[in-house]
């Protein structure tokens, strides 16, 4: 891997919640190291307003400009990393040019959360914390000094939080 900024795409089905969380958290956590993007296989057309509230109120991240978009907008783009955050996106993930590192970080779907808005906000926040922890682990990897196969192995293992200690 190079010393330049890495391009990372988070994918989920609707691009309304989990992939948006990943994109905006990574933008905040590593703006000098990564360009963060998100997209969906079948975009919902809007970002979940509770996800925006969580990002703004709990993580203190400005979400102006957040939008649900298709992965077709990125057709031909050469990503360094593609991370799917839902099982459907993993199954239908297209072939990306440039042989990016691909990993699957499955997370609960906020669209399926039940309860009041406040209960849903708490559940979405928990998903955000899970994604943030995985991003922290990604950022702790010495990517610039690792071979591609090792990077892919470690980035994939991040999804299994009980194996965190084995990453270093």
What is the predicted function of each stretch?
Residues 1-168:
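Short polar/charged helix/loop
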């Amino acid at each position: 891997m190079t010393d330049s900024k890495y391009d990372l795409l988070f994918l989920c089905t609707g691009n309304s919640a989990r992939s948006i969380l990943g994109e905006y958290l990574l933008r905040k956590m590593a703006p000098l190291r990564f360009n963060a993007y998100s997209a969906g296989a079948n975009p919902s057309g809007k970002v979940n307003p509770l996800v925006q509230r969580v990002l703004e109120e709990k993580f203190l991240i400005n979400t102006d400009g957040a939008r649900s978009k298709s992965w077709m907008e990125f057709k031909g783009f050469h990503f360094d990393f593609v991370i799917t955050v839902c099982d459907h996106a993993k199954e239908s993930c297209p072939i990306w040019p440039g042989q990016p590192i691909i990993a699957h970080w499955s997370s609960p779907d906020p669209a399926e959360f039940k309860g009041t808005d406040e209960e849903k906000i708490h559940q979405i926040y928990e998903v955000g914390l899970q994604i943030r922890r995985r991003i922290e682990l990604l950022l702790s990897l010495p990517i610039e000094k690792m071979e591609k196969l090792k990077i892919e192995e470690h980035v994939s293992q991040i999804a299994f939080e009980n194996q965190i200690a084995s990453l270093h």
